[in-house]
Amino acid sequence: MASKSKQKRIQAMNRKETATLAVVIAMISAILAIFQNKYGQFSDIRGFYGMHFADGQHQWPFSTHTLLGSTQEMHPVEYPALTGLVMWLLSFFIAPAQYAWVDYFRLTASVHVALFGFLALYLKRLSSRTLAIIFAVSPAVLYSLNRNWDIWAILPMIAAIYLFEKKKIKLSAFWLAVSIATKFFPLVAFLPIAVYYYRNKQLGDGVRYIGLTMLFWLALNIPFMLINFRGWSYFYEFSYRRSIGSASVFEIASVLGKPIPNADLIFYILNLLALGLVLLYLTKSSKVISIAEGTFFTMFAFILFNKQYSMQYVIWLASLAILAIGYLSKERQTKILILYGVWQVSELAFQYSFFQHVLTRTYAGTATPASPEVTSIEYGVAGLIRYSLAVVFTLALAHNLNAQRKQDASTKKAG
């Protein structure tokens, strides 16, 4: 749970502020994000519709199938159960047409407007209206909002954290299970949850919470397993076998002429090292660290050296970062938010350079070259800046949170 000083700050803010403004701004921002990319360029949403549902037959996404009029066999979707269910159900609202993939993208993005509004609501309840608004207008978050369906997993994860803070443990476990069944990333939250219960000498409660979450997860997944186990398991097999991919630390190093040898082995070493450092942070802190704060650092460590850096990862990091920033005093918040803004700009620049680099290579030597063109070196430098600033922001946040805990402890002692 949150510290008493944190709870008092939030309660005082919530008495004075309503969430309406944050929700409205979030929804307006999400609508503008649709107009920024109204055809869904570089979005999995339109791509997966074309690969799996374009013939209007609405075939089960966790099956090997062939579209009408095609001879190419399509593999199951490489997403967890609930994401596949969402993309399948939404396909029923779109009639086959020449540009049906655009209609499908816009329908899905329109639903995301509502989800983004609810996300802002929970962020406000867990931090403050100002911080929720800052998240809602974060440029890199909006730029990546409709790349795929991650918002469907992020919202229940944040809801689970909120319910945990409210001591509604069973509901929290259920929504965390929903999040894991939608994306699987939130599984990393088990680390800060386990440490939280361990440091509070409540190991039995911790085992029950994690066990209950996994039971809920299993209950959500069993129907999919029974329908087509191979189709259901395809995502997990695909993720395990996935090679080092685009926009990762490994690719950026290669682009800059410093390839990392034995990348597959180094991938595991770096991840274990990063998670080990987070574990040290969680266990050696002067006070028990909240689930919200701990989940940010664990998620950051998990994403930092991922095999592939997908652009929507910034939504996970930004939403959790906002919750962690909420633990700081107003003065410390102001300082760290400046760095948060710089990090967001670097994320946006990196994402833009990534896509322009793809277009530059695709249309090189044609009559319609990309404009502007982004060279491999420019893309690599943008990636280096992005990764560096993300690490700097995270270290600065950890430093400020530790300093805040010490300040709160000394204030309490003096009082």
Label for each model-derived stretch:
Residues F224-I269:
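Periplasmic/ER-lumenal interhelical loops and adjacent helix-loop junctions
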Residues A2-Y234, I266-G415:
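Multi-pass membrane glycosyltransferase architecture that uses lipid-linked
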